[in-house]
Each structure stands twice: as structure tokens, then as C-alpha cells.
């Protein structure tokens, strides 16, 4: 089974991190891997990548004429892949050496049409003590209560997800209006795609936590204002997904909210009462504030969608 790993990049200041991502893919224990790199409308960056890697036999390089965003960039990559499976990783991530091998194990051991793994944090400037693990998803890291091994979920994170190539092609790829592009705030492009996949095939993404990818959490991603803004637009995006795809598109978020309020919050309160701690208190406060902020974004989405 051949795997095509797609890396999209667009900012020159991220070049060192892009190199880390690229080398982590090159260091995989699984051999049958090709790499497709898409530079999103940055000619200077494209020339730099071409100068350093243009002659690499395992790498195909493409540059978009304009900055079209992550979703459209990944769609453009589909024109160049030749593998049976397309695996996606971001330019600020580092794959464990067994990442591809563990994804392939899912396809070879099950009838999965999509597979994804666990995102682990690489705290660039230290772990923020106020951020509860239940909300690690805001910084692109697998959170407490996500899923059990082998469970079929709607989607894993966009930097650790894969699809059978024919499935991606039959779905016409990602919705280009959703996902990162400059300051655009409609997030979660993998959510929209996987919601359509569930409607079309009745299937989700098989979760294998042993397929690990580390995500670099830069200092600015742990800034409280940034986190609250991201939480707001995540809530907005969940409502947008319901409108764009179906009312069931945010079912997993509803189930997580129930688990959060009925299991995790009571557990945290008990722990705080029995063993008082300032970090525990800060995390509990942040948990409530983020939950309310996401709800506010969702309500705003109701007005817009």
C-alpha cells in the first residue's frame, strides 16, 4: 500500500518548522511513501523549497499561483498524488517514526476508508498551567475524552488524518470556502469533509492513538485572548457546519459537552475540594469561560447561518 503524505506551507518564517515536518516524514519506518508539498502562493518560499529539495526523488513540489488557503491547497495536492492513501500533516507538526506504519495497519486490518491518530503537544514555550486538557483541541492537540482506540469518529485532527485516495476524489476533496486562509474565521475544514463522508458512505475515521503526530504549540497559541477568540470562532464554525452539511454535523461536540458537564466538571470540583491547588482552580475557571465563549460563538452563528 503506497501512502502519499501531503504538506502545505505558505509562510517563510515557518521554513525551519516545515523542514522538521518534512524530515519526520522522511524518517518513517514504513517505506512506500511519497511526499507532495504545496506552497500556497509564495514564490520566494517556493524557490527556497525548490532549491533545497527540488531534486529529491521522493518529493513532488507545486506552487499555487495565488494564496488560496489550506483547503484548496490540499485539493491541488490531489492532482499529484499516486498513492492508495493520502495522509495529511501540517508544517508545524512532527510525525512519530511509526506514524504512517500505524495508519497503514488500520487500513490493512479493517475495512476503514479513513484513519487518523493522536496529536500530542510540543510546548514550545512551556505548558500553560491554566489550560485544561479538555480544551487542548483548541491548540490542535488531542484532548481528554476524545475517543477509544479503534473507535470510528467523525474526524481526527487535520494534521493527523488520512483517507483512501478514491474516497477523497469521489468527495471532490475539501470545501475551499472552509479552512485557514489569512484571517478567515470559518474553521474546521476536515470536519466539513468528514461530515459529507459520513453522509455519503455512512462511515467515519478510525482512530488509532498509536499513530502519533506532535504539534508545536507556539507561545502565541497559549495567549488567553487568542484562545478565547479561537473558542468563539470554533463555536461559530460548529453552527456553520450544521447549516452547510446537516444538523448532525456537531453531534460529537454535543456528546462531548454532555461528558464535560456530567463527568469532567464534577471530577474536577471533587479534586479541587479534596486537594486544593491554584492550577486546578485556574483550569476550572478557564473551562467554564471557554465553554461559555464557544456557546456565544454558536449563538452568533445562528444569526449568520
Feature-to-residue mapping (PLM):
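Conserved donor NDP-sugar-binding/catalytic core segment of glycosyltransferases
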Residues: 98-130
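N-proximal low-complexity "stem/linker" segments adjacent to membrane-targeting elements
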Residues: 1-24
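A short, conserved alpha-helix in the catalytic core of glycosyltransferases
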Residues: 160-163, 167-171, 178-211
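Short aromatic/hydrophobic "clamp" motif used to bind/position activated sugar donors
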Residues: 86
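Short, acidic, metal-binding catalytic loop of nucleotide-sugar glycosyltransferases
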Residues: 22-32
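Short, flexible, basic/aromatic active-site loop/helix in glycosyltransferases
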Residues: 134-154
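Glycine-rich, basic loop-to-helix element that forms the pyrophosphate-binding segment
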Residues: 64-81
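Non-catalytic, C-terminal membrane-associated alpha-helical segments of glycosyltransferases
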Residues: 229-233, 247-305
Amino acid at each position: 500500500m503506497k501512502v502519499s503524505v501531503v504538506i502545505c506551507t505558505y509562510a517563510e518564517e515557518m521554513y525551519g518548522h516545515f523542514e522538521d515536518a518534512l524530515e519526520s516524514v522522511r524518517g518513517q519506518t514504513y517505506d512506500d511513501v511519497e511526499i507532495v508539498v504545496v506552497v500556497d502562493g509564495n514564490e520566494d518560499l517556493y524557490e527556497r523549497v525548490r532549491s533545497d529539495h527540488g531534486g529529491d526523488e521522493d518529493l513532488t513540489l507545486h506552487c499555487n499561483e495565488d494564496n488560496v488557503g489550506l483547503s484548496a491547497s490540499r485539493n491541488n495536492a490531489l492532482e499529484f498524488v499516486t498513492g492508495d492513501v493520502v495522509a495529511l500533516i501540517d508544517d508545524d507538526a512532527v510525525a512519530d517514526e511509526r506514524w504512517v506504519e500505524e495508519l497503514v495497519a488500520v487500513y490493512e486490518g479493517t475495512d476503514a476508508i479513513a484513519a487518523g491518530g493522536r496529536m500530542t503537544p510540543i510546548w514550545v514555550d512551556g505548558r500553560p498551567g491554566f489550560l485544561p486538557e479538555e480544551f487542548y483541541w483548541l491548540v490542535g492537540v488531542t484532548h481528554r475524552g476524545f475517543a477509544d482506540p479503534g473507535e470510528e469518529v467523525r474526524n481526527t485532527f487535520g494534521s493527523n488524518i488520512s483517507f483512501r485516495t478514491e474516497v477523497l476524489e469521489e468527495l471532490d476533496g475539501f470545501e475551499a470556502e472552509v479552512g485557514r486562509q489569512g484571517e478567515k474565521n470559518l474553521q474546521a475544514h476536515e470536519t466539513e469533509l468528514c461530515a459529507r463522508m459520513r453522509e455519503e458512505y455512512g462511515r467515519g475515521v478510525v482512530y488509532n492513538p498509536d499513530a502519533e503526530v506532535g504539534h508545536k504549540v507556539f507561545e502565541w497559541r497559549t495567549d488567553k485572548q487568542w484562545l478565547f477568540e479561537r473558542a468563539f470562532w470554533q463555536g461559530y464554525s460548529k453552527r456553520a457546519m450544521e447549516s452547510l452539511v446537516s444538523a448532525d454535523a456537531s453531534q460529537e461536540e454535543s456528546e462531548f459537552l454532555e461528558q464535560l458537564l456530567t463527568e469532567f466538571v464534577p471530577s474536577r470540583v471533587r479534586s479541587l475540594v479534596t486537594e486544593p491547588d491554584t492550577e486546578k482552580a485556574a483550569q476550572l475557571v478557564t473551562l467554564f469561560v471557554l465553554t461559555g465563549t464557544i456557546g456565544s460563538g454558536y449563538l452568533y452563528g445562528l444569526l449568520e447561518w
